[in-house]
Design a protein with these regions (language model features):
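Nucleotidyltransferase catalytic core that binds NTPs
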Residues: 1-178
Length: 178
């Protein structure tokens, strides 16, 4: 049986994550996913939006995932590899790990694990930052519309000072002279 290990934060689970994990599963018979602990996320990226228990449950609920575990809180990042003993570590196309460095360290530790970089996946909402950006953009537009709609009716209909936009129109659409 070929065991594949994938890893990530998986904060705001999205299609890019699903694609990564399903592609990783295709490399073997069993997929074990290491979900970054809250402490690791805080140290390396940002305050997590969803906590580790929720993230590991969401990832574990995916059909392609056989088991999801929470990674260690710090220390040796290779300890989990020694514990899980995967045949393959699948890296996402956008993960900032150097597969040659990982392979060299695994070899140095006597772990016969192969490291595979998965191919690029493109979708307009395939990343957490893209999703957050779209939400903020939509929220900004929504707030602008709300501000316009909250203006009193007189302010919406009243002509601007110094214009003749309140003058009656002739049948041809021009302004009638008074």
């Amino acid at each position: 049986m070929v065991r594949v290990m994938a890893q990530g934060v998986f904060d705001l689970l999205h299609l890019g994550h699903v694609h990564y994990l399903c592609r990783a599963k295709e490399l073997g018979d069993e997929l074990v996913v290491v979900v970054a602990s809250d402490a690791t996320v805080r140290r390396r990226k940002h305050e997590p939006i969803t906590l580790q228990d929720m993230r590991v449950e969401l990832v574990g609920a995916l059909r392609c995932v056989d088991r999801a575990v929470i990674g260690s809180e710090g220390g040796d990042p290779y300890a989990i590899v020694a514990e899980l003993r995967p045949d393959i570590i699948a890296l996402g196309y956008d993960q900032e790990h150097d597969e040659r460095e990982i392979s060299a360290e695994l070899k140095r530790r006597g772990l016969p694990t192969r490291v595979v970089r998965l191919d690029y996946y493109d979708h307009d909402l395939d990343g957490t930052r893209k999703i957050i950006s779209k939400i903020l953009s939509m929220w900004s537009i929504s707030k602008a519309i709300d501000r316009i709609e909250e203006r009193p009716a007189e302010a919406k209909a009243a002509p601007e000072a110094g214009t003749d936009s309140g003058a009656p129109r002739s049948k041809k659409g021009g302004r009638r002279r008074g």
